[in-house]
């Protein structure tokens, strides 16, 4: 049995993860939660801060906000247990901190936990270099009106994957305005916020005579929860410090 502490247990994703752990993952048990809202109805105790939690566990799973990062890393270092980061909105300084922390603890990070997005991300490594010479590349990401970070972490993941796959130097733009001709080396990430859109990411390769679109739509938050719980199963026995991702969980390398 994999024992999990869930940070952000009272939020929307916390509810979904808690439910799926009980109904679909017999080898995973949420043994405690961490959240500012300690009054949520859960089958496990909820603590306001990591340092208040004294429950024995195997994996610390975070689905909250970027500002929880340092306290979670500190807790994982103290307990010598793996940390799974599923939050987005990290700054450049945060990412550097994550990189350094992975030298001390087993640290898993993914901008998107869905199997589909991670397949798309790996597909882009092959597709982008083939199409770049004759196609312009644009991205559109759409999310609900409560999402606070823009562009989404997933959009940045896809954009950076495309950049890293190309031999030429490219520059990212975030939205367009004004009067200017598009430059060949631009990759523009466009953001939409509205309604209850769970998550929609579209990569557009626009050529003179044809357009190729690679699109992923999340129609249920279950896809993120399933990925997160699979990551918990994968990370439970990890003791060696290092960086881990969904590529490791899904054994993606194509």
Curated annotation (Swiss-Prot):
Active site positions: 143 (proton donor/acceptor), 147 (proton donor)
GO molecular function per UniProt: 4-hydroxy-tetrahydrodipicolinate reductase; NAD binding; NADP binding; oxidoreductase activity, acting on CH or CH2 groups, NAD or NADP as acceptor
The EC number(s) this enzyme carries: 1.17.1.8
Catalytic activity: (S)-2,3,4,5-tetrahydrodipicolinate + NAD(+) + H2O = (2S,4S)-4-hydroxy-2,3,4,5-tetrahydrodipicolinate + NADH + H(+); (S)-2,3,4,5-tetrahydrodipicolinate + NADP(+) + H2O = (2S,4S)-4-hydroxy-2,3,4,5-tetrahydrodipicolinate + NADPH + H(+)
InterPro entries: DapB_C, DapB_N, DapB_N_CS, DHDPR_bac, NAD(P)-bd_dom_sf
Main location: cytoplasm
Subcellular location: Cytoplasm
Bridged cysteine pairs (disulfide): none
GO cellular component, one term: cytosol
Positions that bind (S)-2,3,4,5-tetrahydrodipicolinate: 144, 153-154
Enzyme class: oxidoreductase
Residues that, per the record, bind NAD(+): 8-13, 35, 86-88, 110-113
Biological processes annotated in GO: diaminopimelate biosynthetic process; lysine biosynthetic process via diaminopimelate
Pfam families: DapB_C, DapB_N
Top-level taxon in the UniProt lineage: Bacteria
Record keywords: Amino-acid biosynthesis, Cytoplasm, Diaminopimelate biosynthesis, Lysine biosynthesis, NAD, NADP, Oxidoreductase
Function, as annotated: Catalyzes the conversion of 4-hydroxy-tetrahydrodipicolinate (HTPA) to tetrahydrodipicolinate.
Family: Belongs to the DapB family.
Protein name per the record: 4-hydroxy-tetrahydrodipicolinate reductase
Organism of provenance: Clostridium perfringens (strain 13 / Type A)
Top-level taxonomy: Bacteria, Bacillati, Bacillota, Clostridia, Eubacteriales
Gene giving rise to this polypeptide: dapB
